[in-house]
Amino acid sequence: MIWKRSAVLRFYSVCGLLLQGSQGQFPLTQNVTVVEGGTAILTCRVDQNDNTSLQWSNPAQQTLYFDDKKALRDNRIELVRASWHELSISVSDVSLSDEGQYTCSLFTMPVKTSKAYLTVLGVPEKPQISGFSSPVMEGDLMQLTCKTSGSKPAADIRWFKNDKEIKDVKYLKEEDANRKTFTVSSTLDFRVDRSDDGVAVICRVDHESLNATPQVAMQVLEIHYTPSVKIIPSTPFPQEGQPLILTCESKGKPLPEPVLWTKDGGELPDPDRMVVSGRELNILFLNKTDNGTYRCEATNTIGQSSAEYVLIVHDVPNTLLPTTIIPSLTTATVTTTVAITTSPTTSATTSSIRDPNALAGQNGPDHALIGGIVAVVVFVTLCSIFLLGRYLARHKGTYLTNEAKGAEDAPDADTAIINAEGSQVNAEEKKEYFI
């Protein structure tokens, strides 16, 4: 009886150990994603294994490897590692047909399995842009289509103009004939203008198989447009006697032909003085007859455009002496005049002398100097009149000749009595002069 109880206990102990061991013997796998044409690594691990065999099989339930023994003749499939705890194999040059569920089997009682799904990404082809025919005229409607095939899952298409993304452009995806990959297309519509000339329109394909390097296609636009014309003067304030250059700045595609210059609707009136060189009109020296409207015309195969410039020739401003110099001229003139009153014979020469410092750098008539000279002449005249009057006043009186001696009312025959000064205090005092 005791022996039977002991046997039963041993049986349950063995069953418990087997159950515990079988719970630790469970294969572990992971799903794998690989780009078409790449290499996939399939790994199966067992934490606790009592020398039980491991096996990998493909979605068609074909055995690939049984422990370290290769079962399927496929040169793309190689053994990476084989042990009681791990069985790893590699599949190179993966194709879309390799995608599916792979099984790792642990041959215990019962057999335990673990699934690993192999996902193969289809790489999109390089995109192509169609719909552009050069050249395009300004104002036309442009329609560009970008298409790419072979992506799995379907790729995304984005549009850019000079690296600036164009938002909200729709795209269409279609399943390919193999029912595994997709063809994606997108159409961009916009109306072109001259600012679009030379712009690079880019179609970019984004896909998880491309990592950080997207597929791109580029189309550089060529837009033809009529010329734009602008006249630029060499000076904003043209003056009489100065040269003037008018530059006709014209832009267009195709490049405009040589520009045409006209004045007031006709030809240039003075070709010798108005020289056209390329896009420039050079007026050698300006005068009042040059006033008018100058027109520059530029023409290309698309059309014609023009610009106008109204020329007004301004007078050269008079260069006058500063007002602070005039008092110094007057002072110098007065000083010279004092010398003239003591030497009348030198008056003509002295009055014509000009102050060289005051007149330095003057080309026109000096009105200030003329006014100073007039003032000197007037001053000299007034001084002469004053001296003459004083002289006559001093010699005022009555004079008698020898013939008047016999007169009855004559005081003395040999004496002439002259009144010295009418304004003196002693009016009776007389002086005698002999003639």
Swiss-Prot record:
Cytoplasmic side: 389-435
InterPro entries: CD80_C2-set (IPR013162), Ig-like_dom (IPR007110), Ig-like_dom_sf (IPR036179), Ig-like_fold (IPR013783), Ig_sub (IPR003599), Ig_sub2 (IPR003598), Ig_V-set (IPR013106), Neurexin-like (IPR003585)
Stretches assigned to the Extracellular side: 25-367
Glycosylation site positions: 31, 51, 291
Annotated Gene Ontology cellular component terms: axon; neuronal cell body membrane; plasma membrane; synapse
Keyword entries, A-Z: Cell adhesion, Cell membrane, Cell projection, Disulfide bond, Glycoprotein, Immunoglobulin domain, Membrane, Phosphoprotein, Repeat, Signal, Synapse, Transmembrane, Transmembrane helix
Key word Glycoprotein present: yes
Domain Ig-like V-type: 27-119
Main location: membrane
CDD domains: IgI_2_Necl-3 (cd05884), IgV_1_Necl-3 (cd07701)
Topology within the bilayer: Single-pass type I membrane protein
Domain Ig-like C2-type, chain residue ranges per copy: 127-219, 227-312
Keyword match Membrane: yes
Intrachain S-S bonds: 44-104, 146-203, 248-296
Signal peptide: 1-24
Gene Ontology biological process: homophilic cell adhesion via plasma membrane adhesion molecules
Post-translational modification Phosphoserine, affected residues: 423
Location of this chain's protein in the cell: Cell membrane; Synapse; Cell projection, Axon
Function noted in UniProt: Adhesion molecule that engages in homo- and heterophilic interactions with the other nectin-like family members, leading to cell aggregation. Important for synapse organization, providing regulated trans-synaptic adhesion. Preferentially binds to oligodendrocytes.
UniProt similarity note: Belongs to the nectin family.
Name under which the protein is recorded: Cell adhesion molecule 2
Organism: Homo sapiens
Gene: CADM2
